[in-house]
Amino acid sequence: MYIAFEGVDCVGKSTQIELLKKCFKDAIFTKEPGGSELGVHLRKILLESKMQFSKKAELLLFLADRANLIDIHLVQNKNKLIISDRSFVSNMAYAKFDFDQNILFDLNSFATGGFFPQKIVFLHGSKELIEQRLSKKNLDSIEKRGVEYFLNIQNALEETLEILKTKIDIKILKLDASLSIENLHEKIKEFIND
């Protein structure tokens, strides 16, 4: 089973994934971007570089990472539990302001070969929560875009998930990121085991 965690920065995806590593020791854990050697380099370029990219170039770099990760690492483990920090859903949500959703879905279908998550854990945060957590960290180039940007992305994630429910067989668990870490963890484990 392939499970992806979605949500904007600072909603606790990484925290929950770290907790799951203790419960599901045989699972494959990955992230997008950066789940493969190519992805590590692309992530560094995209998030830390001072280089400027066109929106189309940025989209294609994310797609290249996804294609490589899925073809080389995930498909061969498709019969295992795979847990990913982000997936094509983020790509579609982040790019929806610049590209048609149908084109984005088709590009992601091509890049993934149709290998999509069966379950999505969507962590949703309030403006106050995101603001508070962003203020406590060193920001990368995307995080520097600010709270309003992340609220727009969060709305785009929700819209994208609604669209995807009509296109692919997917189960979605939406959780309030302000719940306690333990409460979130229990709900997520139950969803995975269901």
Swiss-Prot record:
Keywords: ATP-binding, Kinase, Nucleotide biosynthesis, Nucleotide-binding, Transferase. It catalyses: dTMP + ATP = dTDP + ADP. Its EC number is 2.7.4.9. InterPro entries: P-loop_NTPase (IPR027417), Thymidylate_kin-like_dom (IPR039430), Thymidylate_kinase (IPR018094). It holds the Pfam family Thymidylate_kin. One of its GO terms (biological process) is dUDP biosynthetic process. GO terms for molecular function: ATP binding; dTMP kinase activity. Belongs to the thymidylate kinase family. This is Thymidylate kinase. It comes from Campylobacter lari (strain RM2100 / D67 / ATCC BAA-1060).
